[in-house]
């Protein structure tokens, strides 16, 4: 078994009827009649972990996938082999949840993501690198977030700052603004508003 077996970009893994497109032809949105839109061949789909093949796992939402991997029942030998990989998978899924993306399916096409969702995915990937001394510039990252998810995102941003990074955010959400160390207020009526949180608020 090789990684390319699970890639719809490789002739070893892709469905031979649709060449990994998942549709009848390049101009169609009708799912491939052979793979049903899964884009992979029967060999790739026959391999299962925890009773699920790669397509079934990637068709889960991020929170469901984290639950699946956290509750995966494997043998002692399999655990020795997969321990590092499973830890990496669960950490990355948790980062995505921490930035409010629990509802997104793993197989969602990047072109269907909103600007805010794409921005938070990039942020989650940066959080996972444990990079220090970086400058992040974010444009309204809380747009479209539920208040609970907003708090998770603010905590994630605070953690990034605490390990030695600088974050500049363009934001209108009051809670996010109040969580910052320094505020610069632009726009009509802003006057000389700018400075530490206490002096501005």
Regions from the PLM with identified roles:
Residues 1-201:
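Conserved phosphate-binding elements of NTP-dependent enzyme cores
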């Amino acid at each position: 078994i090789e990684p390319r077996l699970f890639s719809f970009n490789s002739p070893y893994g892709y469905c031979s009827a649709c060449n990994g497109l998942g549709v009848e032809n390049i101009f169609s949105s009708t799912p491939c009649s052979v793979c049903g839109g899964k884009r992979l061949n029967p060999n790739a789909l026959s391999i299962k972990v925890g009773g699920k093949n790669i397509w079934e796992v990637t068709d889960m939402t991020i929170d469901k996938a984290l639950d699946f991997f956290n509750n995966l029942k494997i043998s002692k030998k399999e655990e020795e082999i997969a321990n590092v990989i499973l830890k990496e998978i669960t950490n990355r899924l948790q980062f995505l949840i921490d930035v409010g993306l629990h509802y997104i399916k793993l197989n969602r096409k990047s072109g269907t993501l909103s600007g805010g969702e794409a921005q938070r995915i990039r942020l989650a990937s940066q959080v996972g690198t444990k990079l220090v001394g970086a400058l992040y510039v974010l444009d309204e990252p809380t747009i479209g977030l539920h208040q609970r998810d907003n708090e998770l995102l603010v905590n994630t941003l605070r953690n990034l700052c605490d390990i030695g990074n600088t974050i500049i955010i363009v934001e209108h959400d009051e809670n996010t603004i109040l969580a910052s160390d320094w505020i610069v207020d632009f726009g009509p009526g802003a006057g000389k508003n700018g400075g530490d949180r206490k002096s501005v608020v």
